[in-house]
Structure formats: structure tokens, C-alpha cells
Amino acid sequence: MGQVTLEPLKIPDRIRMEVTAEREWTEAANRLRARVLLPAAFAAPAPILPGEHRVFMVFNRKGGAGKTTTTLELACAWAAMGYSVRVLDCDPQDAGLSGWLEPVYPEGMAVENRKTLKDVLYGKAGLDEATYFTRYTNVYIVPSYEDCAVAEYDPSVSSERILRRAIKQSEAPVDITIVDCPPKIGKLSTYTLAIGGKIIVPSQVSALDAKSGESLRQAITDAQDDYDVETVAAVLTAWDATNIAKSVGNQMAVDYPGALVCPVRKTVDARTAPDQMKSIREFAPRSTTTRDFDQLGRLLVAPREEVAA
């Protein structure tokens, strides 16, 4: 199997976003600059030590917010930093993450022997059995497809801690698990949030996303009351210099005071990469979108080489 090894990026200062302690954009739209807004209590990220494991959940109640793109690009960014990353596709659809980041099955494995998230939920396979290589070195996936949605309504799948236990029982040497959560509030989203960890909230810069912001914030507040989770980043996907970008960004800073707010600038490459079945990082490593996701990844986790620093 020929895999693609994702390399670290060198981001020129003229491209890199300013990182600031300010919590709002005040300039006019025609002068709007992409900046990362840090929370007051922000601490520089630490590298992941050998034997340590961190969980990130990418969550939004609305489809089209950039959730799947954020999941894949952060996984690729962290792999390029030297980490092994397992992606849990918990948003089952045939045209979702598992169709974009396809699992690479062992040669000769019969279709009926291929495990998915559904098998994990039904107790027919452990998480490691359902974990497969992908086209990228150090990026693995637990795939899911439309048939997994049956677990949403099946009373026999009733333990909300099932995925949390599956991760704890895993023996795979994975540094980071990143979860593409389902947009619908239901059993599957409950299972993902019950894992515990750090929530990343992507929101597309649009009027519709602005209108849905209150219900999203309430859902995350409820999750923080019930589970061991914290919101660490709000990501403004498809960002451009407009009044709506300014409005959505400023509202996200208010809604998630403990999270960094990070724009990811819109480019043609970001729309084209899925058609080529490639991550944006592979398809256009020098694009602004790739570099913004890379900068976000480094604000959440320090590169592996810093362990020895």
C-alpha cells in the first residue's frame, strides 16, 4: 500500500494569521483581517507525551458548517506534526468522511469481514478491529456508512458510554482521537459527547449559521453540564472579509469565552479537494486554507518534536 506522508509546513509571516488577546473585530469589513482571537485564560499548548492520549470532538448541529473538513484537515495537520491520529466517523452517510477519507482494507479481506462503527456500537467488534489505514501515513479511520444510522433508533443500543469504553479498551498506539460528530441531536451525538474531551465548533460564515448559533450554544452548554467536555476552539470556515464574517466571529467569541476563535480563509482549493478524493493539505499544501488549519492545529497541540525541547 502506497501511502502519502504529510510534511510539516513552513508558513510565511505574510500568510500567518496574527494571534491576539483581543476578543472582537472592530474594523470595517473592507479592512477586516483574519486574526486568531485567544481567550483570556489561554495557555500555550503542550505536546503529547508518549503514552498520553487526547480526544477532540468536532461538533455542530447544522450540516454544511465545515465539520467534516475540519475533522480531516486537523487530523492531517497533526499527522504532519508527528502524531498518530485515529478518526471516528460518527456522522454516518455514504457521501461523508468515510467516502472522502476511505479506509484501506487488508488485501483479500472479504466485504462481510470489514468492520465499521456500527459493529462497535452493537458490540460485534472492538474499536481496534474497526480501525483501518488510510491513504495518509499515521491517519487511521473507524468508518461508518448510512446503515449505522439504525443504531439511532434501536433500543438494544442503549449504553451512552459505549464509545468511551471502546476508546479506553483500545490498545492501539494512537496519540489523538478526533471525532466527526453527527449534526443531529440524538443517541449517536450523545455517545460521542459522552466520550469526553475537547470540543471544536466549526461554523460557516453565513447568515443561516448566525441564526442557528443560539441553539448550538445551548446544546454545547448542556453537554458541558452532563459530560467531561470543554470547548477549546470555534472555527470560522469559509471566512472572508465581510460584515457577516465580522458578526459571526464576534458572536462566537461571546458564546464561547473559553475558546480560541480561528478563521479559516475561503479558497477555491478547499472546494475542489473533495472532488479529487484528497485532503486540502495534500491537494494544495500552499493554500491559505491549508495553512490556516495547520496554524489551528498547532494552537491546540504542540508539535511532537517539542517533546525533546
Pin down the residues of each PLM region.
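NTP-binding/hydrolysis catalytic cores, primarily Walker-type P-loop NTPases
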Residues: I280-A309
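Conserved catalytic-core segment of NTP-binding enzymes
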Residues: T5, M81, R86, E171-C262
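Walker A/P-loop phosphate-binding motif and the immediately C-terminal alpha-helix
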Residues: I48-Q93
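Extreme N-terminal, non-catalytic leader segments
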Residues: G2-R61
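Beta-strand-loop-alpha "switch" segments that mediate conformational coupling across diverse proteins
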Residues: P12, A238-N243, G249-R281, F293
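Cytosolic-facing regulatory segments adjacent to core modules
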Residues: L127-I185
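Conserved nucleotide-binding/hydrolysis micro-motifs of P-loop NTPases
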Residues: P92-D94, Y136, D147-A149, S206-A207, ...
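Phosphate-binding loop that captures ATP/GTP phosphates
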Residues: M81-V85, D91-I141
